[in-house]
């Protein structure tokens, strides 16, 4: 009964409109997200796949604007899961999810999770970003080592790569902090 009343009340105010319009509750949510994170901008999405798709596009766009067309590759991790769009499937490091969807998008290099040497060996003049989950949960539960994450931040800074954390499963307080990256004492891009 309470849910029906709340839905009815909201539907009488505003049911749904595009993100292109000013929506006061959305502005308040954006302010709260900025207050509790490293960022000063928010991009609202409808799903984790859409959020990761946007991260991939933004990384490539940033690199294209800064370095032109040559830097588009993103280093991702084996056993990862980033979504079911064609780009996020391509970024997913589990071959079972690739079946039936090949050819996938080019530009993703898979590295063993928590293996700094593998990441270093994968960086080349085409690399624009490193993308990973801090806790992998679809391919088994694997937690990133703190020194590994700090090392990734250092490498990303050294090579001017973006460091992207997929926090779809770990954000919003699910690990005891608002975002999981806060446990690692670093900030993503």
Q: Predicted segment positions?
A:
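Conserved N-terminal phosphate-binding loop of PLP-dependent enzymes in the Aspartate aminotransferase
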Residues: 1-189
């Amino acid at each position: 009964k309470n849910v029906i009343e709340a839905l009815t009340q909201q539907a009488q105010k505003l049911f749904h409109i595009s993100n292109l319009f000013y929506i006061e509750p959305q502005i308040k949510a954006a302010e709260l997200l900025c207050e509790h994170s490293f960022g000063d901008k928010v991009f609202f999405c409808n799903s984790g796949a859409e959020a990761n798709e946007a991260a991939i596009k933004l990384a490539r766009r940033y690199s294209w604007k800064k370095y032109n067309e040559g830097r588009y590759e993103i280093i991702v991790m084996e056993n990862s899961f980033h979504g079911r769009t064609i780009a996020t499937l391509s970024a997913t490091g589990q071959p079972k999810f690739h079946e039936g969807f090949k050819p996938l998008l080019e530009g993703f290099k898979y590295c063993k999770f928590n293996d700094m040497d593998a990441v270093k060996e994968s960086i080349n003049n085409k690399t624009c970003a490193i993308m990973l989950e801090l806790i992998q949960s679809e391919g088994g539960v694997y937690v990133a080592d703190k020194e590994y994450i700090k090392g990734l931040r250092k490498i990303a800074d050294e090579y001017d790569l973006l460091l992207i954390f997929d926090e779809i499963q770990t954000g919003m307080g699910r690990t005891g902090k608002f975002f999981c990256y806060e446990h690692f004492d670093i900030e993503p891009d």
